[in-house]
Each structure stands twice: as structure tokens, then as C-alpha cells.
């Protein structure tokens, strides 16, 4: 009662600047108040809107430490996570050109992860190595994102360029030892037209990436092991179709990406802004093992995926310091492989999702509601394995800004989300699927269909001087599941009851 009372008590607090200009908004409010964060994140996903929704000459430098612990996880998840992040972001305008950039360095350690050596960026790919033995994984990831826009002909013809670059290294420190290197580079070039109440942009997208995976053993006795099931290495090539792989445990995944995008902004009056963004991407992955042949490699699997997405956001400034935001996002993914062992398509993947979020700001309060529906299908043609499940999410949130004297604020947020699966089905072939594949399929099925309740709470303390501010962030997330659906297979482990994640960060705003 005291906790909710602190949120609902009526006190004078610092809120949005009286100016309608984004650049005059207090820096702490812009970076951490959810009604600004939702606009900021939309502009980062769609770089053509950087001049509209990114605060100029405000930069952020921060460090964050996270710890996660629990046994409610997917088959290839982790029991424990320790992560540290260093990041910086900012935007400036120079000679009629907008420049935005963000850099981050992440270092994490995962405890007790099994069944897949992976970068965690390519989770639906059909080919990977894994074992029943639990590993400790260390990961390092560098990310550099940028956006540039210059408007020509009296600001009527904007040309924008978005760049995303990622470089990662992932390795385990116990047998079987995985060593994974990944990179991704993507460009999006846009040309637009600005009118008094309408702006639109057409974009072309090109990307390239790769993953290099090697698995080995420090202890030589495991290199020819076929007796101890924990140390046997398996190669998955499909959905549950796995075979033992005792030598040449490596592959390269070459990724090519191309697509188009469209971005529209409507400004019917000075109180309303309506953004609509859409994209289509075609992604092609080629899994290869290097050899001494004339071609220099052996093709293992080609995986192609079509991705269509929409990103809608409506912002309305109402009377009496009230503000409404409505966001809608949707995505459709359709993937299928060409398996060179069968010279035919074997694996198919489909994922449809739509999510809705609304925010209503009234003075120092922000009320939020969100909902989402998700449908996933995975099939393996040779074995006959098939998994289908629907997921529904509903949630509520409350945010409040508290004034602490003349130079500091606290921004508090609490939220609750409920998720369940109204429809699901799993078929696993007893004859064509070994224990390794069954452990993955059944554990994931239990995890994805489990009803769950999630609670989150975050607090941000920060100063709001004209320049040079500090903030401290604390976040806690807790998730617990309900009853698991019944299955007719005995697993070595099932998803546990709980998962907890805590984050603590410090940032300097300048």
C-alpha cells in the first residue's frame, strides 16, 4: 500500500518542458521518460526520422551491470547471466546535416547453457552444433550504429543513410569448446520529399553478415568419444534431425540481405503526428564447411527467409498537459531451407507477430497498456517433426515523475504482464528423432506454451541542470510460470519456476 501510495499521492513534480520544441525538453526527461523513449526508439528503428524525434546536442555516456538467475528458461537458455555494458549515444546538427551515432560494448558470461553453440543472433537457423554437456559461455559484442540526413532544395529533398555494424566473439571454456565469431553490416539509403503536412521516404536496404563456428576438445579422450552421451557432439540440420559429428566440427554461415522500405509522416495539425513505416527484407544464408575441393567448401544448407514488417506510431498532444501515444508493430517471417543431404527443402519456419501499446500522460503520471499476439510454426520434412503454438500477452504499466527539490528528479515505473498459449501442438517422430533432438523440442515446447506472470519495476534518479547531468538507474524484473502442458516423454530437465533479472547503471548526460 505504501508503494502504490507513493505513486498515486499528489505532489508537484518536474514534467515536460512548457516549450513544444523537443530540443528544449529537459535531458533527463528525454532520455528516461517512457513517452519520449517510445518516440526515440521508433526514430532509431527508422533513421529517416532522426531530425524529428532525436534531441539535438544531447549526448549520453553510461555503464550498466546486469545479473540474471533462474531455471525458467528455454532448452538452449542459461541458468545464470552476468553482463556489463559500456555505451554512448548522441546527435548534433552541422551545416544543415543531422548526425546521430551510438556505440556499445557488451561483455557477458552465461552459466550452464547447453544443446547449442550459438551467437544468439540467429536463433531460427536450421544448422548448428550442440551437446548435452552444459557449458559456460563468454561473449563480447561491439555495436556501432549511425544515421545521417541532409535536406536539399530548401529542405524539400532529404537524403538519409542508416548504418548498423556488429562484431562479436563467443567462446565456451569447457569441453566441448565452442568458438564463434559473428559480424553484421547493414546500410539503408533513403530519398524523401517534405511537404507542409506530409513527408515520405523510399529506402533501399543492403546487408552482409557471417558466423564462423568451431567446436573442439581440450581433453583428447573426448575427440573420438561415442560412449559418454554428455560429450558427444551433434550436428542439427533441420528441426530435430541431428547426427553425430566427431571431426571437422566447423562451418561458416555467409549471410546476404536486401530489401526496400517506405516511411510516411502525416502532420494534419500542430497537435498530431502520425508515423507509418514498412519494410520488406530477403535474407539468404549459406552454411558451408571449408575443404580442399576446387570449390574450396562443401555446401551444407541454404536458408532463405522473407521478412515483412510495419511500424506505426501516433502522437497526439491534448489539452491540460495530456499526451497520447499509440504504437502498433507487426512482423511476418517465412523461412525455408535447401538441405544438401537430401537435395530438397526440409525445414520450414514461420513467425507472425503483432503488438499494440498505448500511453496516456496526465500531468506527472503516465498510464500504459500493451497487448501482443504471436504465432510460430516449425516443421521438419524428413522426420515429420512439427511444432505450432500461439502466444498472447497483456500488460499494464504506471510511470510517475517525482520532484526532489529544484535540481533532481526520480522517475519510477512499475508494470505487470500476463502471457499464455491458447493453442499449441507438437509432434515428434519416435523413430527419426534421437534423444538430443527430443530434449530440445520437448523443452522448448514446454517453455513456449507455459503460462507466466511478469513484474517489472525501475527507478531513475537524475539531476536536471541546464548542462552536465548525472543519473542512476535501477531495474528489477521477475517472471514465474504456471503449470506446464502434459507431454508423453521423460526429460532430463524441464523449465523451472522462476527467472529474475536485475540491472544497475550510471550515466552522464552532456
Predicted regions mapped to residue ranges:
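Outer membrane beta-barrel transmembrane domains
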Residues: 120-131, 230-509
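Internal, well-ordered domain-core segments that constitute the primary functional module
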Residues: 140-235
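Short loop/turn motifs that connect adjacent beta-strands in outer-membrane beta-barrel proteins
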Residues: 17-22, 49-59, 90-101, 150-159, ...
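Outer-membrane beta-barrel "beta-signal"
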Residues: 19-26, 196-197, 497-510
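N-terminal, post-signal peptide beta-strand-biased segments of exported outer-membrane/organellar beta-barrel
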Residues: 11-111, 125
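A broadly used, surface-exposed interaction patch
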Residues: 117-151
